[in-house]
């Protein structure tokens, strides 16, 4: 059975770094969600305009399809995207199961305190997501609770390496349980 692992959370939690590391540790493909945003979404975010639900649906569908397709290489793939709301996570699961009915979807949601993320984003250069938009992400954020296949991981002041190890441990437990 294939598994699609989605690493999410608000901008600045390190999901791209953690997701890429996880894919290396699991020896499976990595799909960076930011690479699949249409230019219209990038333009909005670059100008400090938060995305709406309508801006996200096509992007989430395309990203999920790419991730599901990538599982055919090794039986697993890691995808990163914010998946801030329950309805986004449900949509990802729906699309994944439509594409591959027996796929397992594991969602690893990284979250942190606003001030920690704001400080980290203030030091980040060259990314289209500006720290001025962090407030809108926190307004939208629904941390998973008792949600099938979803695990919330609080980052705190942990290093990216420590978070990566925690994420890998959860992923391996779930992957072992599916075999």
Residue ranges of each PLM-predicted region?
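Conserved nucleotide-binding/hydrolysis micro-motifs of P-loop NTPases
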Residues: 37, 83-85, 111-116, 159
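Small-molecule kinase domains that catalyze NTP-dependent phosphoryl transfer to phosphate-bearing small molecules
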Residues: 123-168, 174, 178
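Glycine-rich phosphate-binding loop used to anchor ATP phosphates in small-molecule kinases
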Residues: 54-101
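Conserved glycine(s) of the Walker
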Residues: 14
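The conserved Walker
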Residues: 11
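A glycine- and Lys/Arg-enriched "phosphate-lid" helix/loop adjacent to the NTP-binding pocket
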Residues: 44, 49, 96-144
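Conserved substrate/cofactor phosphate-moiety recognition/catalytic segment
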Residues: 17-68
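Hydrophobic anchor at the beta1->P-loop junction of P-loop NTPases
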Residues: 7
């Amino acid at each position: 059975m294939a598994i699609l692992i989605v690493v999410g959370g608000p901008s600045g939690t390190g999901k791209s770094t953690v997701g890429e590391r996880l894919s290396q540790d699991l020896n499976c493909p990595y799909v960076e969600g930011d690479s699949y945003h249409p230019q219209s979404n990038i333009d909005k975010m670059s100008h400090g305009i938060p995305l709406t639900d309508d801006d996200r649906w096509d992007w989430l569908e395309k990203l999920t399809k790419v991730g599901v397709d990538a599982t055919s290489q090794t039986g697993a793939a890691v995808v990163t995207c914010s998946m801030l709301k329950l309805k986004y996570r449900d949509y990802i699961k729906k699309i994944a199961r439509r594409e591959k009915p027996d796929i397992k979807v594991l969602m690893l949601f990284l979250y942190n305190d606003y001030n920690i993320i704001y400080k980290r984003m203030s030091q980040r250069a060259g990314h289209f997501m500006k720290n001025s938009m962090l407030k809108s992400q926190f307004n939208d954020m629904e941390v998973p609770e008792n949600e099938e296949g979803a695990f919330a991981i609080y980052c705190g002041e942990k290093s990216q390496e420590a978070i990566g190890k925690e994420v890998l441990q959860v992923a391996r437990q779930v992957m072992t349980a599916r075999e």
